[in-house]
Amino acid sequence: MNEEQRKASGQVSSSDKKSEKDYSQYFEAVYIPPSLKDAKKRGKEEVEYNQFQIDERFQGLGNGRKFYIRTYGCQMNEHDTEVMAGIFMALGYEPTNSTEDANVILLNTCAIRENAENKVFGELGHLKALKREKPDLILGVCGCMSQEESVVNRILKKHPFVDLIFGTHNIHRLPELLSECYLSKEMVIEVWSKEGDVIENLPRARQGKIKGWVNIMYGCDKFCTYCIVPYTRGKERSRRPDEIIQEVRRLAAEGYKEITLLGQNVNAYGKDFEDMEYGLGHLMDELRKIDIPRIRFTTSHPRDFDDHLIEVLAKGGNLLDHIHLPVQSGSSSVLKLMARKYDRERYLDLVRKIKEAMPNASLTTDIIVGFPNETDEQFEETLSLYREVEFDAAYTFIYSPREGTPAAKMQDNVPMHVKKERLQRLNALVNEISAKKMKEYEGQTVEVLVEGESKNNPEILAGYTSKSKLVNFKAPKEAIGNIVKVKITQAKTWSLDGEMVGEAIEVN
């Protein structure tokens, strides 16, 4: 609950005791949920840029305490987890890999599909017993699910043992929220329907020293009819270029070999700047001059992928020619229902431009099958587009209605057995083309950024090529964190086996 909601209710104080009798009804009276309707009405209010700092009141709040964060969903959630972990550690908390040892447990959630939400509710069920054993444990739910009013109300009614709920726009207020949890016997809820400002100088506990996430913008204004993200992540807000460039320079100085620029729609970067014309192409053109071997970005929206960005990417160097370009459907009619704001031909024209500028570019995509009203003929159009483009890989999904989105009001009239059959056919095509493209690597020598031991065999090292191909090979452990040359000896559908050739590559 934020301060406005608290003042409006006039019913909550830190000294109140938790009511076991009618707890959920009590909170229904004072809790104002995030509003999807209001999200769609948002205007173009000026975004404020603020610097994060921890109030001296909260210094040492975590001394002698441990935290555990379980992350669901996309790279943005992984990035947010790094930020929250950084805040925890700045407060004096220590990380732990065990829920049993934790004094604070956060579930950083994903709302993109119903299956992701079910996993979180299942985990809450498992943690109920632990909370009963450790009543002083703080159990929190954050991330995109927290921005959905139906989810918050479900937690209030069915999981009243949860201590803390907060959304995606107020991660920077974690110190205040934790302090309130310790002082109050009530569930602490702070979910802002309105997107927050851009907060700089946030601490981060990055996972490893090889690859790093760099957020360049927040939110999405596209409002595709099936997607909950514009509601859970808010309007598009870009970080200032100088802040991003400084962060990338710091990572380069710390020895990172690869960075990925993050945003719900990175191609819209800079469109909200009123004082200058500056887009993703301009940013990439500056970042390519920084001494870091590899720079990627995700996720792209075809609608905003402009010619200037293609021109800059074609300069190569540390700008990788692996582009994730979600198409969602090969049918113009379905794309119109999805409100993607491009049709089949416009997408194919964009692909042609990319391949003309970067003949060796690797393209991957996202595809949804079984969207409302999708016919057999329209699904065949998706298959034909996939064959024409020959994507290196695809993330494929059965359509999942999300409450509050326009598509959820459409009649979900494609039977589940048809959806599953279409997904099976699509995946067969995806596997076929992937195997064909991977086969072309046999006998080639590729550069691999070594990330660590293989998950299946500690004697084998694993890493990725510039085109995101997984490579497994034998090499000394000293190769971890370096870019090495590997000759490919065997291609599989989704990975490559090889032999290390020579020493690690020096990157100047």
UniProtKB/Swiss-Prot annotation:
Main location: cytoplasm
Catalyzed chemical reaction(s): N(6)-dimethylallyladenosine(37) in tRNA + (sulfur carrier)-SH + AH2 + 2 S-adenosyl-L-methionine = 2-methylsulfanyl-N(6)-dimethylallyladenosine(37) in tRNA + (sulfur carrier)-H + 5'-deoxyadenosine + L-methionine + A + S-adenosyl-L-homocysteine + 2 H(+)
Alphabetically ordered keywords of this record: 4Fe-4S, Cytoplasm, Iron, Iron-sulfur, Metal-binding, S-adenosyl-L-methionine, Transferase, tRNA processing
Residue numbers spanned by region Disordered: 1-21
This enzyme's EC code(s): 2.8.4.3
Entry-linked InterPro entries: Elp3/MiaA/NifB-like_rSAM, Methylthiotransferase, Methylthiotransferase_CS, Methylthiotransferase_N, Methylthiotransferase_N_sf, MiaB_methiolase, rSAM, rSAM_horseshoe
Domain TRAM, first and last residues per copy: 439-502
Cofactor(s) the protein requires to work: [4Fe-4S] cluster
4Fe-4S as UniProt keyword: yes
Radical SAM core domain mapped to chain residues: 206-436
Positions that bind [4Fe-4S] cluster 2: 220, 224, 227
Entry note: cofactor: Binds 2 [4Fe-4S] clusters. One cluster is coordinated with 3 cysteines and an exchangeable S-adenosyl-L-methionine.
A single Gene Ontology CC term: cytosol
SMART domains: Elp3
Quaternary structure (record): Monomer.
Protein function: Catalyzes the methylthiolation of N6-(dimethylallyl)adenosine (i(6)A), leading to the formation of 2-methylthio-N6-(dimethylallyl)adenosine (ms(2)i(6)A) at position 37 in tRNAs that read codons beginning with uridine.
Sequence similarity: Belongs to the methylthiotransferase family. MiaB subfamily.
Protein name: tRNA-2-methylthio-N(6)-dimethylallyladenosine synthase
Lineage: Bacteria, Bacillati, Bacillota, Bacilli, Bacillales
